[in-house]
Amino acid sequence: IDSTKLSLFDNASTQYVNFVNSFGTSYSTLRGDASWARDTLDSRTSPTRGIVQSAYGEMGLPGGTLHYYKINYQHQWYHPLARDYTLRLNGEIGIANGLANDPLPFFKNYYAGGISSVRGFKSGTLGPKDSNGEAIGGGRRLVGNAEKYFPMPGLGQDKSIRLSAFKDIGTIVASND
């Protein structure tokens, strides 16, 4: 059971205020979780070949005050391009929504942007914004990355430090869009 207590600031987003006005500030969520992972990488620290897959599901079950679901899937693929060059492709998708006519709790929203998803953006800044211009996240997340790893000049065969060129894409969409 997850227990959550919220406090809102004076300039809180309308989305947050509306949620608190409808559902109050204290929640007890009976949460069910399930996950699965598969890893065939040839190295933990500097992979050149293999895949990593993971899936995760979370649900606010009947018996709690919040009813929702979240489903995430990630697939990473490493492939050697040449002796010292590796291609990494990564795709992530997340879908979340409220259940039983409840909205998705705003604190369960997805976020993207930043070093772990879409580099070049500040952390968590992609997607819908509130009336103050602040990111509020959403119920849909899509992220894709392509990276080419190559050796650091002067280090020879040491793969513990590599350089990379990358391209990232991603978006966050509100639950009701």
Predicted regions and their residues:
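C-terminal outer-membrane beta-barrel translocator/porin domains of Gram-negative envelope proteins
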Residues: D2-I161, A165-I169, V173-N176
